[in-house]
C-alpha cells in the first residue's frame, strides 16, 4: 500500500492569526529549537525555576485576595487564611515553601553556570540578565518576608532597611523615605506589599529577556565547546521536554514533602508571634537563602564596610566574564579550577551556616575568614588560575 505523503494543509484560522500575531510560529520555533545533544539533568534547572516562578505568581495572587496590608490586621489576616479560607493553609505553605524551592533551583542554576563557564563569551549578557533576575528575586523575597507581620518580619525589616543609613550624607533620608515615616510602620507595610505584588511580573519580563539572550547563541554544554555541525544538536522537543518532565517529577516530590510534612522547617518560630516594636528577638535571622550574604554583612565591624561587602559579594558576579581569564569554559577540562570551584562552594555553604548562628565568637572570626576567601576566589584566584593553569585537551565535537 502506498503511503499518502501529501503535506498537511495548515489551518486557515491559525494562518490568519499567525500572520498578524506570530504566536504559533513562536511556539514552533521553541519545539524545533536546536539544542546541544549532550546536556545533562543540570540543564533542567532553568525550566524548574520557571515552573517555580509560575507557582509563586499564582499562589501569590490568590493570597493577596485575602491579605490585609495593615499593621493592625496583617498578622490576623494570615492566620485567617490558614484557618477560614478553603485550602488557605495549602496556598500559604505552597507560597512559603515555593520561595525556598525557587531559590534552591536558582542557586543550583548559578552553580552550574559557574562550573561549566556559562558566563563566558558570547553569553555575557545572558549571565548579567540572570544576575539581575537574582537581585530582583532577593528584593521580592525580602518584602514578602515582612508581610506576615510577625516578630521576625518586623525586626528583619528594621535591620535590613537600617542598612541604608550607612550611606554617607543621604542614608538617613533614604531610610525615612523607605519607611514612609520615622520607623517601620503601616506605610512601610503598604509599600512592601505593593512592590511584592509588582516585582514578580518584572521578573517575568526579565526571564523573557533571558530567553531571548539564550536563543541568540544557544545553550552552553558540559564540554563547553561550540556547536560545529547540525549533528551536534537535537530538537528541544521532544528530547529535552521529556527530560524536563523527569526533573519536574523529582522537584515536585521534594516540594510536596516540605509542604505536607515540614512546612515550617525553613521558617522561624518567632514569626508566629505578632510583631512587637517593644520586644527585640534574641536572635534576628533572615530566611536561609539570605544567610551567606548576612554572614558577610556581619563579618565587618563597621556598618558601612559590612554593607559594601554584602552588596559587593553579589555585584562582583557581574565581572566574572572578565575575571576568568581562561579560554576553556568547562571545569571538566580545568583540573585546578575544578578543585577551586568545590572549595568555593564549601565556603558558600559555610557562610550560610555562619549566617544562621548568633553574632558572637567564634562565628564572627570564622565569618571573616570565609568572607575573605569568597572575595579571594573571585578577584584573585580566578584570574590567576585562568592565566597559569594548563587545561586538558578539548574534544573536537560533542
UniProtKB/Swiss-Prot annotation:
Cofactor needs: heme b
Q: Which InterPro entries does this one have?
A: Cyt_b/b6_C (IPR005798), Cyt_b/b6_C_sf (IPR036150), Cyt_b/b6_N (IPR005797), Cytb/b6-like_sf (IPR027387), Cytochrome_b (IPR030689), Cytochrome_b_C_euk/bac (IPR048260), Cytochrome_b_N_euk/bac (IPR048259), Di-haem_cyt_TM (IPR016174)
Q: Which SUPFAM superfamilies match?
A: a domain/subunit of cytochrome bc1 complex (Ubiquinol-cytochrome c reductase) (SSF81648), Transmembrane di-heme cytochromes (SSF81342)
Recorded topology in the membrane = Multi-pass membrane protein
Positions contributing to heme b b566 binding: 109, 210
Indicate the transmembrane segments per the record: 45-65, 96-116, 129-149, 164-184, 192-212, 245-265, 277-297, 304-324, 339-359, 366-386
The entry's keywords: Cell membrane, Electron transport, Heme, Iron, Membrane, Metal-binding, Respiratory chain, Transmembrane, Transmembrane helix, Transport
Q: State where heme b b562 binds.
A: 95, 196
**Purpose of the protein:** Component of the ubiquinol-cytochrome c reductase complex (complex III or cytochrome b-c1 complex), which is a respiratory chain that generates an electrochemical potential coupled to ATP synthesis.
Name of the molecule in the record:
Cytochrome b
* Source species: Rickettsia conorii (strain ATCC VR-613 / Malish 7)
Q: What is the lineage of its organism?
A: Bacteria, Pseudomonadati, Pseudomonadota, Alphaproteobacteria, Rickettsiales
Amino acid at each position: 500500500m502506498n503511503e499518502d505523503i501529501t503535506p498537511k494543509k495548515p489551518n486557515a484560522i491559525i494562518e490568519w492569526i499567525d500572520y498578524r500575531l506570530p504566536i504559533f510560529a513562536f511556539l514552533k520555533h521553541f519545539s524545533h529549537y536546536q539544542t546541544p545533544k549532550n546536556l545533562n539533568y543540570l540543564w533542567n534547572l532553568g525550566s524548574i525555576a520557571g515552573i517555580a516562578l509560575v507557582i509563586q505568581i499564582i499562589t501569590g495572587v490568590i493570597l493577596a485576595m485575602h491579605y490585609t496590608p495593615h499593621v493592625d490586621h496583617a498578622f490576623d489576616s494570615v492566620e485567617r487564611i490558614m484557618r477560614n479560607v478553603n485550602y488557605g493553609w495549602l496556598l500559604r505553605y505552597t507560597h512559603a515553601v515555593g520561595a525556598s524551592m525557587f531559590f534552591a533551583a536558582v542557586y543550583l542554576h548559578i552553580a552550574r553556570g559557574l562550573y561549566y563557564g556559562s558566563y563566558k563569551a558570547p553569553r555575557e549578557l545572558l549571565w548579567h540578565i540572570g544576575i539581575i533576575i537574582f537581585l530582583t528575586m532577593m528584593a521580592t523575597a525580602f518584602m514578602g518576608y515582612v508581610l506576615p507581620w510577625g516578630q521576625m518580619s518586623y525586626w528583619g525589616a528594621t535591620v535590613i532597611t537600617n542598612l541604608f543609613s550607612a550611606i554617607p550624607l543621604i542614608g538617613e533620608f533614604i531610610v525615612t523615605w523607605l519607611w514612609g515615616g520615622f520607623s517601620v510602620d503601616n506605610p512601610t507595610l503598604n509599600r512592601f506589599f505593593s512592590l511584592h505584588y509588582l516585582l514578580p511580573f518584572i521578573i517575568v519580563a526579565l526571564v523573557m529577556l533571558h530567553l531571548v539572550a539564550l536563543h541568540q547563541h544557544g545553550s552552553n554544554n558540559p564540554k563547553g565547546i561550540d556547536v560545529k555541525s547540525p549533528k551536534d544538536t537535537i530538537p528541544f522537543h521532544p528530547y529535552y521536554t521529556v527530560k524536563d518532565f523527569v526533573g519536574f517529577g523529582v522537584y515536585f516530590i521534594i516540594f510536596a514533602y516540605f509542604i505536607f510534612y515540614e512546612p515550617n522547617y525553613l521558617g522561624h518560630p518567632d514569626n508566629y508571634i505578632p510583631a512587637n516594636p517593644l520586644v527585640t528577638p534574641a536572635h534576628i535571622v533572615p530566611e536561609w537563602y539570605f544567610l551567606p550574604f548576612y554572614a558577610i554583612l556581619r563579618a565587618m565591624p563597621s556598618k558601612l564596610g559590612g554593607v559594601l561587602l554584602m552588596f559587593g559579594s553579589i555585584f562582583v558576579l557581574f565581572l566574572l566574564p572578565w575575571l576568568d581569564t581562561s579560554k576553556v569554559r568547562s571545569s571538566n577540562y580545568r583540573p585546578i579550577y575544578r578543585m577551586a570551584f568545590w572549595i568555593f562552594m564549601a565556603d558558600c555553604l559555610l557562610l550560610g551556616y555562619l549566617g544562621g548562628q548568633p553574632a558572637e565568637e567564634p562565628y564572627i572570626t570564622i565569618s571573616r575568614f570565609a568572607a575573605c576567601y569568597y572575595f579571594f576566589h573571585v578577584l584573585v584566584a580566578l584570574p590567576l588560575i585562568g592565566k597559569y593553569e594548563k587545561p586538558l585537551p578539548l574534544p573536537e565535537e560533542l
